[in-house]
C-alpha cells in the first residue's frame, strides 16, 4: 500500500491482495486520512471478486457517511456494466480528481 496526500486528497495505491476489510478498517482508523477525499487506485489489478468489491463498498460508505468527503475508485479495467452502481469509479486518476472537484462544487451549492 502506498499513500500520497496532496492538499485534501489522499490517493491510496492498492494491489489485489490488499483489497479487503482489514485494509479498509486500517485506512478508516488512520487519523491523517480523516480530513481527506479518498481515491483508491487499483494499480495493476485486472479483476475484482465479490469480497473485494464488498470491502471497497464498505470503505466508500464509511468515508462518505458524513457527506463531507468524496470516495472514488480508479480501476483501469472499469466497465460500468460490471461495476456496482453504488461505487463511484472511473478508469483514470484524472477522472477521479474531476469527480471530486464536481462533488465539491455540488456540496458548496447545496450547503448555501
Label each residue range with its predicted role.
Residues 2-112:
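Amphipathic, Lys/Arg-enriched alpha-helical "gate/interface" segment within cytosolic domains
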Amino acid at each position: 500500500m502506498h499513500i500520497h496526500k496532496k492538499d485534501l486528497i489522499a490517493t491510496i495505491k492498492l494491489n489485489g491482495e490488499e483489497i479487503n476489510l482489514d485494509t479498509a478498517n486500517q485506512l478508516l482508523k488512520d487519523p491523517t486520512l480523516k480530513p481527506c477525499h479518498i481515491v483508491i487506485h487499483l494499480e495493476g489489478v485486472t479483476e475484482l471478486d465479490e469480497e473485494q468489491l464488498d470491502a471497497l463498498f464498505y470503505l466508500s460508505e464509511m468515508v462518505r457517511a458524513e457527506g463531507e468527503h468524496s470516495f472514488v475508485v480508479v480501476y483501469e479495467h472499469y466497465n460500468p456494466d460490471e461495476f456496482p452502481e453504488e461505487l463511484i469509479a472511473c478508469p483514470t486518476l484524472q477522472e477521479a480528481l474531476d469527480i471530486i472537484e464536481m462533488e465539491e462544487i455540488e456540496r458548496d451549492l447545496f450547503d448555501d
